Amino acid sequence: MAVNAGVRVIATTRNRDRFSKLEKLGAERCEIERRDLSKHIAEAKKIDAVLDLVGNSVMLDSLAMLRRGGRSCLAGWLGGLDPIPDFNPLLQMASGVYLTFFGSFVFGTPGFPLSDVPLQQIAADAVAGRLDVKPARIFKFDEIREAHRAMEANQAGGKMVVVHH
C-alpha cells in the first residue's frame, strides 16, 4: 500500500530469504532486522516515517532513524511487550520527531470508525493486482495446531488463514 502511494520503502525482515518477496512487493531494498539498524544504514536521520511492527525492543532505534519532523508509528509487538527500561523521551528522542502507536483493537470504535478506512480503494487495488492480498498459507480448522506451530517457528511467511466450514 505504501509503494502504491508513492512511498520509497526500505523493508526489514529477520530472514534474508524473504528479500526477493519484499522487493517484488515494491521495497526499494531490504535489510536484516536488528536492534541497532540506525547505525548501519546511510539513510539514518533522513527517514520520513517508520512503521514499527517489531515493537518496544527496537522502538528507540526506530526513532533514531528519523529526520526532524519524522514520525514513527508503533503498530506491532513481534519483539515482545517488555517495557523499555527507564524510557526518558527528553533524553532518548531527538527534538522534533513524533512517536505514535496504533492498535487494531480500536477499529470500529468512535475514535476510529470503519468509515475512515478506505476499504473500497483497498479492494479495488487488490482486484486490479496493485495489492497482493493472497495469504501465504491456508489451513483447515482441524489443522489449527499446525498453523500455530508454523507461526511460533517463524515459518508463516506472511498472513495465514484458518478456514472453518
Where are the regions a protein language model picked out?
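C-terminal hydrophobic helical "lid"/dimerization subdomain
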Residues: 111-165
